[in-house]
């Protein structure tokens, strides 16, 4: 059992030697990749060491119990510990999403429901910012279009983590958030106290570590500049600082007007464009990544909800995993961990099942 770990241990030892080489740290891109892989393998090696020790301990206990019944009392505890250790190791050996250790760019857009939808989009942004803070991630709003009543029509925010462990990566957690989020509550503008249903859409992209990862031909870009506008469409800038970049081969369009500088808006637009192109390239190379990404788009286009936020009942429900809890107030303040963990667990169960059938 776990014969494949032998090769992973050898790879782990090789990476450990590489990390002691000063030349590695002169190449930030390679150094980052080596550190990430080393952190991932370290978890596997530690789990395997624990499993091997428990296996040996159980075997020894059984041999001793055959000679002296007094040792038999230790066997049930060791068997349970070995079972838990084996399950932990099996999960660690599930092939990971190669993007798990990446940072992420999230887009939140108002959907059905007009002004209430825009207000809910703002609430979702607040929820994710609080969640990021609880995980000690950095959050940067790179583009935001507000509504007349203080809500959000569209916002793009970049989340950056510090852990080299893929299991703790930003993308590893936020990738499950793509889709339609539905809210049920009494809007502040509702005088009759009736519950309204509205929705907001979320898209998530893995962020490109280095610009060189995604090759972009400058000749494929159409760049338009215009004056930035505020709620209602009124101009808020007297110079052409806003930027719209169209990538001709894919038709992807990214607009930025958050910064006062045209250069800063252009850099931000290119940052988002690279993330979207990376996602598209990976879709074309990986059928699983393609299906995952199409799932985000499909749910948004068909208005299929992935999650419902019911304020009158203080209830949150994830319709993909069956997760349900009555602590919506805490979730909206950033206590999103258990909801996302239910998605991670469901994903792992699916991957384990696929491994068993292969």
UniProtKB/Swiss-Prot annotation:
PANTHER family: LD18447P. It comes from the Bacteria. It comes from Leifsonia xyli subsp. xyli (strain CTCB07). PROSITE patterns: RF_PROK_I. SMART domains: PCRF. Its main location: cytoplasm. Methylated by PrmC. Methylation increases the termination efficiency of RF1. One of its GO terms (molecular function) is translation release factor activity, codon specific. Belongs to the prokaryotic/mitochondrial release factor family. This is Peptide chain release factor 1. It holds the Pfam family RF-1. HAMAP family: Rel_fac_1. It is found in: Cytoplasm. InterPro entries: PCRF, Pep_chain_release_fac_I, Pep_chain_release_fac_I_sf, Prokaryotic/Mito_RF, RF-1. The modification N5-methylglutamine is found at residue 234.
